[in-house]
Amino acid sequence: MFASTVFVSLLAVAAAVPTNPQGQSCGNGNTVHCCNAETANKLTKGGILGALDLSNLLGQCNDVTAAVAGGAVPIKNTCSSQAVCCGEIHQNGLVNLGCTPIFV
């Protein structure tokens, strides 16, 4: 009985601990980008990729302006889709995984 009381008490305390909110900045020298399903036109203009409809699969992310990155404007008001932290923005390839989402 005592063990279950201690367990429930610890569970209640752990649930009540405030978490750090996901900020509007990225660590480790990464930059914030908005991914609003912007198509990669330079990849789909000609050749074999031009014949395929890859506009829904290929995309890029826009840099977030200094006012947004500095916290003057909330990211959720700027990004209509998803804000991400990118460390490797110079990517060459078909599948690039240099960004991680941040939740706002």
UniProtKB/Swiss-Prot annotation:
Q: Which Pfam families match?
A: Hydrophobin
What does the record note about the induction of this protein? Shows a very low expression except at the early stages of fruiting body development. Expression responds positively to light irradiation.
**Recorded GO CC terms:** extracellular region; fungal-type cell wall
**Consequences of knocking out this gene:** Does not affect the mycelial growth rate, the hydrophobicity of the mycelia and conidia, or the conidial virulence on silkworm pupae. Leads to thicker aerial mycelia in darkness and quicker growth rates under abiotic stress. Promotes conidia production and increases the contents of carotenoid and adenosine. Increases the biological efficiency of the fruiting body by improving the fruiting body density.
Q: Which domain of life is it from?
A: Eukaryota
Cysteine disulfide links: C26-C85, C34-C79, C35-C61, C86-C99
Signal sequence residues = 1-16
Location(s) in or outside the cell: Secreted; Secreted, Cell wall
**What does the UniProt keyword field contain?**
Cell wall, Conidiation, Disulfide bond, Secreted, Signal, Sporulation
Q: Name one GO molecular function term.
A: structural constituent of cell wall
Q: Note the SMART domains from the entry.
A: HYDRO
Q: Does the keyword Disulfide bond apply?
A: yes
What function is annotated for this protein? Aerial growth, conidiation, and dispersal of filamentous fungi in the environment rely upon a capability of their secreting small amphipathic proteins called hydrophobins (HPBs) with low sequence identity. Class I can self-assemble into an outermost layer of rodlet bundles on aerial cell surfaces, conferring cellular hydrophobicity that supports fungal growth, development and dispersal; whereas Class II form highly ordered films at water-air interfaces through intermolecular interactions but contribute nothing to the rodlet structure.
Please give the family membership noted in the entry.
Answer: Belongs to the fungal hydrophobin family.
Task: Describe the subunit structure.
Answer: Self-assembles to form functional amyloid fibrils called rodlets. Self-assembly into fibrillar rodlets occurs spontaneously at hydrophobic:hydrophilic interfaces and the rodlets further associate laterally to form amphipathic monolayers.
The protein's name: Class I hydrophobin 4
